[in-house]
């Protein structure tokens, strides 16, 4: 069973050792970069979460508050180590994250930007209910802006 856990002095080295395929490196920060972003965005309630399966760290996510219109949770980074991809862990972890944020209830939606060529990521986000907003960010014209709305 997938669990989301806080990053701390006991598990951060496991997270830093995570890796993705060479192609995916074009879409994601390195794990140490994700942890660093969490620190940089700490004033925006940034949270870096380890993704664990049966106690083993298999991925990492970074979510922060986005207080502009529309105010929402901003899923900045989401990665599953290449050894654990295509096993349903990403979908399950994403669902767990959405449940956690929904219970928190600060915002009505979650935003994520995904590179148009990252088909497997796009499928995963759409599978759990994210929808393309049609918005194209001038700073990231190769990305689709997807939004998940809580009921």
State the predicted function of each range.
Residues 2-83, 96, 100, 104, ...:
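Acetyl-CoA-dependent GNAT
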Residues 9, 91, 116-119:
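Alpha-helix N-capping/helix-start residues
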Residues 80, 86-99, 123, 127:
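Conserved acetyl-CoA-binding loop-helix of GNAT-fold acetyltransferases
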Residues 87, 104-108:
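Short coil/turn segments at alpha/beta junctions that flank glycine-rich nucleotide-binding fingerprints
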Residues 108-119, 127-128, 135-151:
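C-terminal "cap" of GNAT-fold acetyltransferases
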């Amino acid at each position: 069973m997938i669990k989301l856990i806080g990053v701390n002095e006991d598990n951060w080295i496991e997270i830093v050792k995570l890796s993705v395929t060479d192609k995916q490196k074009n879409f994601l920060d390195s794990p140490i970069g994700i942890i660093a972003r969490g620190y940089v965005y700490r004033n925006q309630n940034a949270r870096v979460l380890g993704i664990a399966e049966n106690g083993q760290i298999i991925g990492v996510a970074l979510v922060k508050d986005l207080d502009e219109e529309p105010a929402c949770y901003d899923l900045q980074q989401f990665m599953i180590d290449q050894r654990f991809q295509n096993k349903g862990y990403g979908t399950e972890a994403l669902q767990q994250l959405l449940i956690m944020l929904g219970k928190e209830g600060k915002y009505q939606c979650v935003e994520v930007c995904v590179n148009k060529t990252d088909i497997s990521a796009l499928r995963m986000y759409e599978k759990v209910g994210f929808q393309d907003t049609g918005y194209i960010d001038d700073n990231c014209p190769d990305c689709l802006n997807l939004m998940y709305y809580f009921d």
